């Protein structure tokens, strides 16, 4: 039976099947149309948590048979694919979290489904992506490094064109946040589809994350939002996986519609980020950064609760530490952003 037949029959796939699937997609000698057909069939399958773990392991093995380690490293990222065109929330959050002396290794990409992905924004900031061999030196110096997925996984260049051919998110939106080249201790992942949250949390547990939160934002975003109840799956290597809902009002923040979080071009998003980090912006955009930073500070054990994490995030912005972290990381400040 061929691989595509196995996928179509929706039988459970073995690790060997999954390895074949990944190897087919990254093979430059196979036509993109054939790969797109295979990826489309797989994306339309019901999500299988065991297969997700196999997929993550297969992707990591293509480049990192032995994953590098940096002590107490954390990543904060979203799957993308929510089509909200929000500003770069998780990139902005990274500066706030790193300002609390959390070792943030953010793994990001160029945008596929919005006007400005994290790599597009970093380019505008003047912050270069860190190559894996340089991570340790960069982290020792600044406590924050940005890794570009096309650099950490050059094989992805064979997959990106197929993803662009497809209408909407694929299985790679789910895998992207979990194939971090580093073996992380802490992670926060925002997910565009609530049906995927549990499987991704269980996969992070299988990958031995010390603590993590996988969440789906109220009203369909891949970040925690201010517009209602956010679905949270919390991972703790000692106690397992638990789920609950979190409302921004529970942690002292005002409700706001997701539409108030819209971003734009990389230049517009940079202006939004700088206004937040310098304490100029007190709108819902600041609040959503504070909420997501609060979650990350709780996960990374800098706060005993998300509410305490939110208070710490506010303090880091108000004290100027978040903006100091931005400059320490190499972020440029412009009189006029264009």
Curated annotation (Swiss-Prot):
It comes from Staphylococcus carnosus (strain TM300). One of its GO terms (cellular component) is cytosol. GO terms for molecular function: anthranilate phosphoribosyltransferase activity; magnesium ion binding. Pfam families: Glycos_transf_3. NCBIfam families: trpD. 5-phospho-alpha-D-ribose 1-diphosphate binds at residues 78, 81-82, 86, 88-91, 106-114, 118. Mg(2+) 2 binds at residues 222-223. Its cofactor is Mg(2+). Mg(2+) 1 binds at residues 90, 223. Homodimer. Belongs to the anthranilate phosphoribosyltransferase family. This is Anthranilate phosphoribosyltransferase.
